[in-house]
């Protein structure tokens, strides 16, 4: 059965290999992940129309980009199930680092915004958060393009490289992604410090996601560079190790970060207005500073005029209702009693 499968499918024999079922299991998990990710994308599009808090809405475009990158990770699984050739090799070396760089850049941008929100400050606008995510991941895209271009133009095809050289180059291309992981880990820890407790739950989700991702990456890189050669399983286990790490990390993104974020977003959409007593407590030093300057709860609108603002349950400034100048308000005039009139 195994020989017939290899002869009939060549590079695609893992799709019908019954002796090594790792490929069948991983492709099944990848297909399920693709379906779940598409459903989550539709759910995000539906909830984006119902979110009223600007601080919550500003991060939604970045999370939508994050989901698109996760969808790409599940699709990339099939490039590792198919044997390494002149078509799958550039796809592997380019998309693996770029897609993970986009994911961790989105987490970094979200964590950077949370650092402000947990301290009661105003959120970045959605374009700023999105540009941070795209800009930070751009360097990994440039690195991957240069590497693939050099390999293809010099005539040194991937198929002619030794397995150890392929693995070393693959890991070296991911150094910037490892840096993004470490940076996101420390920035997410900074979200634990601040008076606004409601925003800290988002920071804890990012922290847990990055922590589990770091563990996954340490395991599969160690197995790829040290474990497989010592067990004399190189190159037979190389694709399986990378593919397992890829699918596992993609599911971690969904289960630890996206699905909890979606549930928090759904609960906040059901609350029409923030409850009293759940207001973000401003630190003492900020209150004393505002009392000294005699400008409590003042902000500027788009025209530059100062207006009264208040903080919602998430610490988001909202404008207080003011009187409509176009409407007439009648104030009753004061009248004197008969005794006071006689005295006059």
From Swiss-Prot:
The gene is Gprc5d. GO terms for cellular component: plasma membrane. Pfam families: 7tm_3. Residues 1-27, 85-93, 145-167, 226-239 are extracellular. InterPro entries: GPCR_3_C (IPR017978), RA-inducible_GPCR3 (IPR051753). It comes from the Eukaryota. The chain crosses the membrane at residues 28-48, 64-84, 94-114, 124-144, 168-188, 205-225, 240-260. It is found in: Cell membrane. Predominantly expressed in hard epithelial cells, including the cortex layer of hair shaft, the keratogenous zone of the nail matrix and in the central filiform papillae of the tongue. G-protein coupled receptor involved in hard keratin expression and likely plays a role in the development of hair and nails. Induction: Induced by retinoic acid. This is G-protein coupled receptor family C group 5 member D. CDD domains: 7tmC_RAIG1_4_GPRC5A_D. The keyword Cell membrane applies. GO terms for biological process: G protein-coupled receptor signaling pathway; hair cycle; keratinization. It is a multi-pass membrane protein. GO terms for molecular function: G protein-coupled receptor activity. The keyword Signal does not apply.
């Amino acid at each position: 059965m195994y020989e017939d499968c290899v002869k009939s499918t060549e590079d695609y024999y893992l799709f019908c290999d019954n002796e090594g079922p790792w490929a069948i299991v991983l492709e099944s998990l990848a297909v399920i992940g693709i379906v779940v990710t598409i459903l989550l994308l539709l759910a995000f599009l539906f909830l984006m129309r119902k979110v009223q808090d600007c601080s919550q809405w500003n991060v939604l475009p970045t999370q939508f980009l994050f989901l698109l990158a996760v969808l790409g990770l599940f699709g990339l699984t099939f490039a590792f199930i198919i044997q390494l050739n002149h078509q799958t090799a550039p796809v592997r070396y380019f998309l693996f680092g770029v897609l993970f760089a986009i994911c961790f850049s989105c987490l970094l941008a979200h964590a950077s915004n949370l650092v402000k929100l947990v301290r009661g400050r105003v959120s970045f606008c959605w374009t700023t958060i999105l540009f941070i995510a795209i800009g930070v991941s751009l360097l990994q895209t440039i690195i991957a393009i240069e590497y693939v271009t050099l390999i293809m133009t010099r005539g040194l095809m991937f198929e002619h490289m030794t397995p150890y050289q392929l693995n070393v180059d693959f890991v070296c291309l991911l150094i910037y992604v490892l840096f993004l992981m470490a940076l996101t880990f420390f920035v997410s820890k900074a979200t634990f410090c601040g008076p606004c407790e409601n925003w800290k739950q988002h920071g804890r989700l990012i922290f847990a996601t990055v922590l589990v991702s770091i563990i996954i990456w340490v395991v599969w890189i160690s197995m790829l560079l040290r474990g497989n050669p010592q067990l004399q399983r190189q190159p037979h286990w190389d694709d399986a190790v990378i593919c397992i790490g890829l699918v596992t990390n993609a599911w971690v993104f969904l289960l630890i970060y996206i699905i909890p974020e979606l549930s928090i977003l759904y609960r906040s959409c059901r609350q029409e207005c923030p409850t009293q007593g759940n207001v973000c407590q401003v630190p003492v030093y900020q209150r004393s500073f505002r009392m000294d300057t005699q400008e409590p709860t003042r902000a500027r609108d788009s025209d530059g005029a100062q207006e009264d603002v208040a903080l919602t349950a998430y610490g988001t400034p909202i404008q207080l209702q003011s009187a409509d100048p176009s409407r007439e308000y009648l104030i009753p005039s004061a009248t004197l009693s008969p005794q006071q009139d006689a005295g006059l």
